């Protein structure tokens, strides 16, 4: 039923169930997420994910197979948290600039967004000084740069922008078509900039859509230096990161907008291996059989109505 389908989607969003993890990256490549959030971000703090703190963020990324994660909260820095195991927490911040969100990767400390949120000059000023003032690499985040600055990406690059997101797992950022994605990659390649895929995770859901493989030889011998080495690698441009994206519903697909939830489920199934699809079927049919058995038992217990005689 439609209600059952809605409950299935809600459960998938809210339940931090076991998830698919990336494995087999090798000793000389780190699996990295370049954009994620905790409950110090305004759009996490006031939601059902209000308990999604740094530890919960790291635990989510650990289950997904990440070695390092940049915690990039909105216009603020999450408290320091000690962790003895992977993934390594890397520093960063997401600045709400003028009609754009710019992710700064590096130990920026807090950033006053006001001078950068007023106009185009403020936005370009942010990417100009991201290195000198904040010792960070600047990344244009989806969907804002596509929606608001598509015709002047060259100008952002000329001002000093270091990289672009080409995959963002946030539902609102899934509209980037393959054509636009390829245009961004071509621009980055010409200008010597890097491109990344990001979870932009806010605590919802339990399956990563994208991973980044960054070549960092023998990084496990000195994990404390991993964040610095990842940032240094980004300076080598497009070839510095290999983006791995799961099969999903694309913006240019033929699915009608009203059927988007159904299309998401269908395309998810299409991208599964046989073993994963079988696991889904076992769970679905197992739950259905349990519910059916309970219904039968209830019907057996209820006595038949007594006939009345005059």
Language-model features: where?
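C-terminal functional module detector
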Residues: 1-24, 190-194, 199-310
């Amino acid at each position: 039923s439609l209600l059952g389908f809605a409950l299935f989607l809600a459960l998938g969003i809210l339940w931090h169930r076991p998830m698919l993890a990336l494995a087999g990256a090798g000793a000389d490549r780190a699996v990295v997420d370049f954009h994620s959030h905790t409950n110090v971000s305004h759009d996490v703090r006031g939601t059902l994910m209000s308990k999604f703190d740094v530890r919960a963020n790291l635990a989510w990324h650990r289950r997904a197979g990440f070695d390092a994660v940049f915690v990039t909260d909105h216009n603020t820095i999450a408290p320091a948290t000690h962790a003895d195991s992977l993934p390594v927490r890397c520093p960063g911040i997401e600045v709400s600039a003028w009609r754009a969100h710019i992710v700064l990767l590096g130990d920026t400390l807090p950033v006053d967004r006001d001078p950068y949120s007023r106009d185009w000059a403020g936005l370009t000023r942010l990417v100009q000084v991201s290195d000198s003032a904040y010792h960070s690499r600047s990344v244009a985040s989806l969907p804002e740069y596509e929606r608001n600055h598509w015709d002047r990406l060259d100008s952002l690059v000329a001002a000093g922008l270091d990289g672009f997101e080409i995959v963002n797992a946030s539902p609102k950022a899934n509209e980037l078509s393959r054509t636009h994605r390829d245009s961004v990659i071509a621009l980055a390649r010409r200008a010597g900039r890097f491109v990344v895929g990001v979870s932009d995770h806010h605590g919802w859901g339990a399956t990563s859509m994208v991973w980044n493989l960054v070549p960092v030889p023998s990084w496990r011998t000195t994990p404390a230096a991993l964040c610095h080495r990842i940032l240094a690698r980004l300076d080598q441009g497009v070839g510095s990161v290999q983006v791995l994206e799961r099969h999903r519903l694309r913006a240019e697909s033929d699915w009608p907008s009203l059927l988007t939830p159904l299309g998401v489920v269908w395309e998810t199934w299409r991208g599964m291996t046989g073993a994963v699809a079988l696991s889904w079927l076992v769970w679905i049919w197992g739950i259905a059989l349990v519910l059916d058995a309970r219904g039968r038992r209830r019907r057996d217990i209820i006595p038949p109505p007594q006939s009345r005689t005059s």
